[in-house]
Amino acid sequence: FLNNYKDKRIKMASDQTLDIIARNGGITRDELNDILIPNFEFGQDRTRTFDYGERKIKAKIDIMSTPANIIAYDEEGKILKGLPKASKKFNDVESAVEEYRREVKYIKKQIKEIITEQSSNLLRALFLERKWKTKRWIEIFIKNPVMQEFAVQLIWKETDENGKLIKTFRCMDNG
């Protein structure tokens, strides 16, 4: 998220602040970065419901598309071209709908940036042979709908306390 600022002083100050937070929390900067990945109010099943007033629009993060996308569904489950505009026919709350549409546009942009950044972070983790405790791994890669992209696309290995390989595995798209 630091890439959102053009002013290098803001980037540096943000970076230094995050380093301090990690140090004070007794964790590495990479561990803090894992924790800070937002879920954008989407559930573990990658869905979120937008309340338009009398109707509800369901949205789902499609992590398997390139780039990752958000697919909208009407109440019957029909795929929509995007989050629909407010409609008087359905008595939609126009202000809420417009806010949702802006939010989804922002989320799509953020997900793209997160995936790019996390791809680099995970490549570094691979070279450094970084390890996650099972509980933390589940929190980061299974429960966070944005990070599920990596859970399903990578082959993971489980090791014992001594680093001995127990098994390799791959997560399925349904978590």
Task: Give a label for each model feature.
Residues 1-175:
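Non-catalytic terminal/accessory regions
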